[in-house]
């Protein structure tokens, strides 16, 4: 087995007293599978890419939020103008008396959902705090580490307030149409999605919404939905014993032959080849 790449805190933190830092990815390039000896929060600002976390693929774009534990293995591939920020931290160095474990899924290797979404309002507020955190964590002045940790605590609580699961934007949310569209797409894995119906319900222009989506994500709406479904199919092929025809249905493809064509085009191998190759990892 190939040696697992591991990123070390000595290469990313200014001192062994620093608990928090910000690592920009403008843009994020393809990055091989790796682990760390620190943890990170990942927030995607725009563009798209394939994020594989613990063998589960996610097609990511603006608003995606991940909580990554040190032992998690992840990689980035098929990136397209993918812009994100990593807020990296060492749990053992945090000194503030906050309920870190309650606010950060997977904190100290506890069980927790790693993937969430942020709407435009949450993203705007997070970006402001991250800007302050990035500035403070790069300072070499008294109490810079303490100030950075205070800002990190603020960011963690802010994310806790605004995050939601990818397919369930709160009904009372005042988020933008783009946020609501991405949520609706994530909830349409098995069922057909009709953009014209969505636009009628939202009283918006289909043409304008298509333009906004492509500008922010680097993909068309159909491309995004297709790739989200393929990612789900990859996961089911590796981690379930469902027949390929049943997986096709679970992922919104009425015709299993068409599913195979799309899957092969997106991944470079047939569903059965993918299953055989990846079953060897389990």
UniProtKB/Swiss-Prot annotation:
It is found in: Cytoplasm. Residues 179-277 form the HTH araC/xylS-type domain. The record marks 246 as: Interaction with sigma-70. The keyword Hydrolase does not apply. GO terms for molecular function: DNA-binding transcription factor activity; sequence-specific DNA binding. Pfam families: AraC_binding, HTH_18. GO terms for cellular component: cytoplasm. CDD domains: cupin_RhaR_RhaS-like_N. The keyword Nucleotide-binding does not apply. Its activity is regulated by L-rhamnose. When this sugar becomes available to the cell, basal-level RhaR binds L-rhamnose and becomes activated. Activates expression of the rhaSR operon in response to L-rhamnose. Binds DNA as a dimer. This is HTH-type transcriptional activator RhaR. It comes from Escherichia coli (strain K12).
